Amino acid sequence: MKKIIPLLLISFLFFSCSDNGFNNNNPYIPNYSFSVTLNLSFASYSNLNFVSNAIYYAGPEVGPKGIYVFNTGSGYNAFDAACPNQALSSCSTLTLDGINVVCPCDDEEYSLFTGQGKLQYPLKQYRVEKNGNILRIYN
């Protein structure tokens, strides 16, 4: 009995660990390893200083379709700009529509607050860290 209790406690601790719900599995969007820094003091990124504003960033290091970065008011979200439920094609770059992005291939709308849409896959999300006026977006 004395050996069972520590074993149960260790098992409980092991199964209570989580990955913070960060799931980026998507068969349509390849995994790219990248790290980008954006200076919010620069005019091209200054919209991110205001709640519910987004910018599109299409540097070569972030993959074929770029990323959207969004100020939620309590932090920042970054999502791949490729339609999450379409194979990469000429119509699969999301377009900005207020606090949402829309896939031109199927007119599906996704929230920049949550990344959710109505189809199977949500937007592919990337990690964001803020240090002063610098945002680091990476995966």
Task: Describe the role of every protein-language-model region.
Residues 1, 17-19:
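Short hydrophobic/aromatic-rich motifs at helix boundaries and adjacent loops
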Residues 2-7:
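Sec-dependent signal peptide recognition
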Residues 97-107, 117-128:
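Short cysteine/histidine-rich metal-coordination sites, predominantly Zn2+-binding motifs
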Residues 20-98, 109-112, 127-139:
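N-terminal pre-ligand scaffold of iron-sulfur
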Residues 12-16:
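C-terminal motif of bacterial Sec signal peptides marking the signal peptidase cleavage site
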